[in-house]
Amino acid sequence: MANYFNTLSLREKLDQLGVCEFMDRSEFSDGVAALKGKKIVIVGCGAQGLNQGLNLRDSGLDVSYTLRKEAIDSKRQSFLNASENGFKVGTYEELIPTADLVINLTPDKQHTAVVSAVMPLMKKGSTLSYSHGFNIVEEGMQIRKDITVIMVAPKSPGSEVREEYKRGFGVPTLIAVHPENDPEGKGWDYAKAYCVGTGGDRAGVLKSSFVAEVKSDLMGEQTILCGLLQTGSILCFDKMVEKGIDKGYASKLIQYGWEVITESLKHGGISGMMDRLSNPAKIKAFQVSEELKDIMRPLFRKHQDDIISGEFSRIMMEDWANGDKNLLTWRAATGETAFEKTPAGDVKIAEQEYYDNGLLMVAMVRAGVELAFETMTESGIIDESAYYESLHETPLIANTIARKKLFEMNRVISDTAEYGCYLFDHACKPLLANFMKTVDTDIIGKNFNAGKDNGVDNQMLIAVNEVLRSHPIEIVGAELREAMTEMKAIVS
């Protein structure tokens, strides 16, 4: 199979990268009607599969699960997830032939095998859905021309898809229709109905394309969402220990600090996060983050270039074919890092202390979010897509580190995200080696404000605030967060 994106002309590539429209809630006024009475069969019952299925069923839709015969016979976790929640479970041969909508929610590396197995069983005129377009865009999977192909991609882990739905809300979602597979022109109707069924219409929906979703998703997860959080965790911990900070304190500051710091990012963007610092600390964090952006920009651009060209997918799929040799080696090595092996200390850290003693972490978040956004938009990805794949998802990933450190983050994210995370981390740590030699405990481990009078140059502070607040990610972020807030108010 040929990489689909690379078969397109330059103009077609730019057109598909640029598909991005924030949809008005009125566009979802038909609710789930387009799928009412239709048989929905979900392939796979992991976190996304189970939680999306629960939401769809609670929205009045007919949902069942199909698994490989061996998974059913051996009662694997996927079988238990579905059966213990009262869903009908059957083999491909039993359920696929009568399905109107088949939703593929298996791991990325299984998509080619799964789709190749189910497609011959799918009835004429049925619909196939993905929550990530890697199989279509990067692997170039060819779907039978009578089959409609859609994508509904919630921008959060599966557990949050369910929890937000139970609260009467949802999570921001991207929807798309593959232009090569919309024979009856009903793809958008099905995608919108599916999105309503998961609750996504209540939190903000972007009309996207398979290409835009894949190229932006890969970039975000490799750089700021996973890669830089892993690099930052290891470097900050090692620096604190080197400078004599208690290991338990250092471990706790990092493990829970990302979550605390990015919570303000979620509500107020980069400006809201930086506003949690004192004026002198804000100026220092700004200066540090500017230096980090200059150092890391070539690496971010290389990752984006390799994603756009298909080089990243090529080397990752080679590792798939080699039994994940590199992935498993890198995963094991991460588990042996000092940060990962050091338990969080039994010490109380107040919320503000995470900011005051973690200035370098704040600077890394600002640098990483802005760089990811800038690099994506330079490549033709629209601001809204770039926002969701950078700033919006950072708090969600930070939450996984708070639970069980980097192991949990890498367990929860997709296989493509984990592979890209390790590639970035291995390149970024040596890139930052000279910078880290200049770092002391005033910006990581101890309070930057200690012994200072809190005075700053007014013009410098004004200039810093202006740069922060005028960045394009702040402008589009404010609009998208306001839309989400308005919808949440309507729902509640």
UniProtKB/Swiss-Prot annotation:
Q: Spell out the catalytic residues.
A: H132
Q: Which GO terms describe its molecular function?
A: ketol-acid reductoisomerase activity; magnesium ion binding
Coiled coil (UniProt feature): none
Q: Which residues form the KARI C-terminal knotted domain?
A: 209-353, 354-487
The reply to whether Repeat figures as a keyword in the UniProt entry is yes
User: What pathway is it annotated to?
Assistant: Amino-acid biosynthesis; L-isoleucine biosynthesis; L-isoleucine from 2-oxobutanoate: step 2/4; Amino-acid biosynthesis; L-valine biosynthesis; L-valine from pyruvate: step 2/4
Catalytic activity, per the record? Answer: (2R)-2,3-dihydroxy-3-methylbutanoate + NADP(+) = (2S)-2-acetolactate + NADPH + H(+); (2R,3R)-2,3-dihydroxy-3-methylpentanoate + NADP(+) = (S)-2-ethyl-2-hydroxy-3-oxobutanoate + NADPH + H(+)
Q: Name one Pfam family in it.
A: KARI_N
NADP found in the keyword field: yes
Q: Which residues form the KARI N-terminal Rossmann domain?
A: 17-208
Q: Which cofactor does it need?
A: Mg(2+)
Q: What class of enzyme is it?
A: oxidoreductase
Query: Which parts of the sequence bind substrate?
Result: S414
InterPro entries attached to this UniProt entry:
6-PGluconate_DH-like_C_sf, 6PGD_dom2, KARI, KARI_C, KARI_N, NAD(P)-bd_dom_sf
EC number(s) stated in the UniProt entry for this protein: 1.1.1.86
Binding annotation for NADP(+): C45, G46, A47, Q48, R68, R76, S78, D108, K109, Q110, G158
Question: In the UniProt record, which is one GO cellular component term?
Answer: cytosol
The entry marks the following residues as binding Mg(2+) 2, namely: D217, E389, E393
Family classification: Belongs to the ketol-acid reductoisomerase family.
Q: What does this protein do?
A: Involved in the biosynthesis of branched-chain amino acids (BCAA). Catalyzes an alkyl-migration followed by a ketol-acid reduction of (S)-2-acetolactate (S2AL) to yield (R)-2,3-dihydroxy-isovalerate. In the isomerase reaction, S2AL is rearranged via a Mg-dependent methyl migration to produce 3-hydroxy-3-methyl-2-ketobutyrate (HMKB). In the reductase reaction, this 2-ketoacid undergoes a metal-dependent reduction by NADPH to yield (R)-2,3-dihydroxy-isovalerate.
Protein name (record):
Ketol-acid reductoisomerase (NADP(+))
Gene this protein is translated from: ilvC
